[in-house]
């Protein structure tokens, strides 16, 4: 009997799972919030701009070391039988390190400098740099831009590097290496400085055939090309391959065999496809969490406007992986719950339920459109299909009779409408959607939301029993790297998580949602394209950081 470890680094917490490679059984698990959380308003008591989202890399080592030690001890499994370790990570979450690959935020002189810290995926401080990168690419007719949805996001690696070059050159001067946090964890495990094709391909303008797009970087700033060449470029390891064995010292520290193999890191949402078994084309998978990723696989590379990228072999060898997404989903619902009136909070407490459960109870019998509300879910910008992190959310139809649960439902529906925009974009560009999978912690807990999604999308919705699908997907890659399975497909068939339930759309609800969706799309186009300056002008009055 052999086992594999999956380490899943999310936005707010980390998870370490020990998985049976024969049947996918979870033998042991460890879950812990990051000690320093997400650093968004203050760093060591100093105010930071509202567009920033930072983390402390020491939290990642804490998860890895405490988590692996715990599952080995708790499971009583002989470490010799743990054949592989896989890692998934939020992306683009990047780390700046010294020549010893130690993060520069640990240097005393940079303790209070926000640019020395990990730039989390949802850090939007590089929006000006992203715009410059985009405009330069458009002006020079870079054909490969279509592989990234004809857009550049401030969430990606290169704009974040440009941000540090422009605003904290002293940090860049002390930086020897820049890498995805997932690559950094792989380095700590193996002592090898390599890069995953998944992370580079989706977040750093790197392609298997051509490498980095230095022609574009040179036109922006020759110094940028040199930074990428000297500090980012490294040997690339593809998903499905092995980086190598555990470093001897790390094996001893973690209580594992030094023969344990380590796979390259995979982006967290992408790992979910493996965890639930969505490994074919014509299947769209929604990974619902803090944000939502909408993923598809296809034999061909289509240039789909408004998506976040398409990369060959980033999930399954030889297939192109496509990613689109929404920047605020779980975060948005959490925001609404925190605004609940005290009477709702008290009622939920008295009935021994959460505020979410209370609001779901209040809305579950409402018909679509009953509240008279419709919302734009852009509270953290719009990733797809508008690709504009500076857009903000709106809600329409409020009256003095509007209740808090009506607002909550409007936001549930808004995220479903945003998903429909993405699904239609895929379909308009020759990628048929026959099945829709939903995975992550939210679908398992919120049947009301899943009913809304099935009827808005007008598709059978397959809800997976997969609160921890990324960790399972990471463990699958660990199993392949350790030789427990001959291929990713074989490992997926053996280890994937089961279906929880399926929902079929209802004709009356579908019809009502079609009417609402037309209104959503009209508002989407007005505030996203035609009159986008209205909300941006209001935002410009905020204090600049």
Curated annotation (Swiss-Prot):
Quickly give the catalysed reaction: D-ribulose + ATP = D-ribulose 5-phosphate + ADP + H(+); L-ribulose + ATP = L-ribulose 5-phosphate + ADP + H(+)
InterPro entries xrefs: ATPase_NBD, Carb_kinase_FGGY, FGGY_C, FGGY_N, Ribulokinase
GO MF, any single term: ribulokinase activity
Which BP terms does GO give this entry? L-arabinose catabolic process to xylulose 5-phosphate
Identify which top EC class this enzyme belongs to: transferase
Keyword Signal tagged: no
Q: Name one GO cellular component term.
A: cytoplasm
Q: Does the keyword Kinase apply?
A: yes
Pathway where this protein functions:
Carbohydrate degradation; L-arabinose degradation via L-ribulose; D-xylulose 5-phosphate from L-arabinose (bacterial route): step 2/3
Q: HAMAP family in the record, alphabetically?
A: Ribulokinase
UniProt-listed PANTHER family: FGGY CARBOHYDRATE KINASE DOMAIN-CONTAINING PROTEIN (PTHR43435:SF4), RIBULOKINASE (PTHR43435)
Family recorded in the similarity comment: Belongs to the ribulokinase family.
Q: What is this protein called?
A: Ribulokinase
């Amino acid at each position: 009997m052999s086992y594999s470890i999956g380490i899943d680094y999310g936005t707010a917490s980390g998870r370490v799972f020990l998985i049976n490679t024969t049947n996918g059984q979870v033998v042991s698990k460890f879950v812990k919030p990051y000690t320093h959380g997400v650093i968004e308003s203050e760093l060591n008591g100093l105010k930071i701009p509202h567009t920033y989202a930072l983390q402390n890399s020491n939290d990642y080592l804490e998860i890895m070391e405490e988590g692996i030690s715990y599952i080995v001890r708790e499971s009583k499994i002989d470490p010799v039988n743990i054949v592989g370790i896989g890692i998934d990570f939020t992306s683009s979450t990047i780390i700046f390190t010294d020549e010893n690959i130690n993060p520069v935020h640990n240097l005393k002189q940079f303790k209070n400098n926000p640019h020395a810290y990990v730039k989390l995926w949802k850090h939007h401080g590089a929006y000006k740099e992203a715009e410059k990168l985009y405009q330069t690419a458009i002006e020079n007719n870079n054909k490969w831009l279509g592989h990234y949805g004809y857009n550049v996001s401030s969430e990606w690696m290169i704009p974040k590097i440009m941000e540090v070059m422009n605003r904290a050159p002293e940090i860049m001067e002390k930086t020897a290496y820049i890498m995805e946090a997932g690559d950094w964890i792989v380095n700590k495990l193996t002592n090898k400085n390599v890069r995953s094709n998944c992370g580079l391909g989706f977040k750093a303008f790197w392609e298997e055939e051509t490498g980095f797009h230095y022609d574009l970087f040179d036109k922006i700033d020759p110094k940028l090309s040199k930074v990428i060449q000297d500090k980012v470029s490294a040997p690339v390891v593809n998903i499905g391959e092995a980086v190598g064995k555990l470093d001897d010292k790390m094996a001893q520290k973690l209580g594992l065999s030094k023969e344990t193999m380590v796979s390259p890191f995979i982006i967290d949402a992408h790992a979910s496809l493996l965890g639930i078994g969505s490994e074919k084309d014509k299947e769209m998978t929604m990974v619902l969490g803090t944000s939502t990723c909408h993923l598809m696989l296809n034999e061909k590379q289509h240039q789909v406007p408004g998506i976040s990228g398409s990369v060959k072999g980033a999930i399954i060898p030889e297939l192109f992986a496509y990613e689109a997404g929404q920047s605020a989903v779980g975060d948005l619902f959490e925001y609404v719950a925190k605004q609940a009136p005290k009477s709702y909070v008290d009622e939920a407490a008295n009935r021994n339920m959460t505020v979410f459960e209370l609001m779901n109870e209040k809305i579950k019998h409402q018909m679509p459109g009953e509240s008279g509300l419709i919302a734009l879910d852009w509270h953290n910008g719009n990733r797809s299909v508008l690709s504009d992190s500076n857009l903000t959310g709106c809600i329409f139809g409020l009256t003095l009779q509007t209740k808090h649960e009506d607002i909550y439902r409007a936001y549930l529906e808004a995220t479903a409408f945003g998903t429909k925009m993405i699904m239609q974009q895929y379909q308009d560009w020759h990628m048929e959607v026959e099945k829709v999978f939903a995975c992550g912690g939210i679908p398992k807990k919120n049947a009301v939301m899943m009913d809304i999604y099935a009827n808005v999308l007008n598709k059978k919705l397959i809800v997976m029993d997969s609160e921890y699908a990324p960790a399972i997907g990471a463990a699958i890659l660990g199993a392949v790297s350790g030789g427990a399975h001959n291929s990713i497909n074989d490992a997926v068939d053996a280890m994937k998580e089961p279906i929880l339930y399926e929902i079929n759309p209802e004709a009356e609800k579908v019809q009502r949602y079609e009417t609402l969706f037309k209104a959503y799309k009209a508002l989407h186009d007005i505030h996203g394209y035609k009159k986008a300056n209205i909300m941006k002008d209001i935002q410009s009055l905020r204090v600049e950081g």
